[in-house]
Amino acid sequence: MSKNNNILITGGAGYIGSHVSFLLIEKGYNITIIDSLITGNKQLVPKEANLEICDITDTDKVTQILKSKKFEAVLHFAGLIRVEESVKYPEKYIEFNYNKAKIFLDICFQNNLNKVIFSSTAAVYGNPKKDKIIESDELNPLSPYADSKLMLENYLIDQSKNVNVKYIILRYFNVAGADQKMRTGLISKFSTHLIKVASEVATKKRNKLVINGDDYNTPDGTPIRDYIHVSDLADIHLKSLEYLLKDNQSEIFNCGYGKGYSIKEVINCLNNLLETNINFEIGPRRDGDSECIVSNSEKFIKAMSWKPKFNDLNYILKTAIAWEKKLK
């Protein structure tokens, strides 16, 4: 670790940002979080973190924060994440996920904060033509959400050519589960995450789960996804930060386990775990959804000598359900 271990995090009161914050604090980093708390939750912020409640485009406030101490790197999580909503309100997603992020990062670069870890998405691949996707495969975003993420990826790539910017872009596959110590997890009134919604049904917070389409070209007709435990994803951020702080070159990495599960397979796994059957019904397809998207994450695994700790669907589901019970 560098002698100066100050790290700036946007969206640290959110699901993934809070998990990363807890882990970095455990490893001795000093964390400052910028979060507007519009979608974030103050209760998820580690008490050891310095929370600054403001918009990332509040130029005066952000500049004040950047001048208060020397930050080694910024981890950018802040943004909107609902694919279906982005199809209805594309301008909103481009504004929040690209325009606002660009304004914020420009302020960072002007203040010599030039190392960035960006929270991107596997949705930039669209409907891949192969079983497991590598980082150099064709990009074909199917939603404004994915478009907005790819736009910021391209902005970072362009900036790295012109100024002294180093980045790591992390393309998340489907993030699920909760902190094993139950310090943080996913809080959302309108979540569309399968495992979150299924856990709400399992804990009687919802009456039923809606499967959005069972006519896809997959073995059981439902979409296939690669689920990664949020604590493993947090560890990926830690390894990426350590890598970036050693002045290594910029990189793009997939974040997944390389194993796909259909929606019905996840439901069956949950039923076996609970020894019951959760209620579900078949609904229409959801705009912007991919059919099958599974990672090849060998690039990250080899670069970082990384091994997942929680690569087990049962464990992901157990922690998700435990978190829902805690929220009750």
Predicted regions and their residues:
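Basic phosphate/pyrophosphate-binding loop/patch that engages nucleotide-derived ligands
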Residues: 109, 158-162, 191-195, 200-202
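C-terminal substrate-binding subdomain of Rossmann-fold SDR/epimerase-dehydratase oxidoreductases
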Residues: 197-328
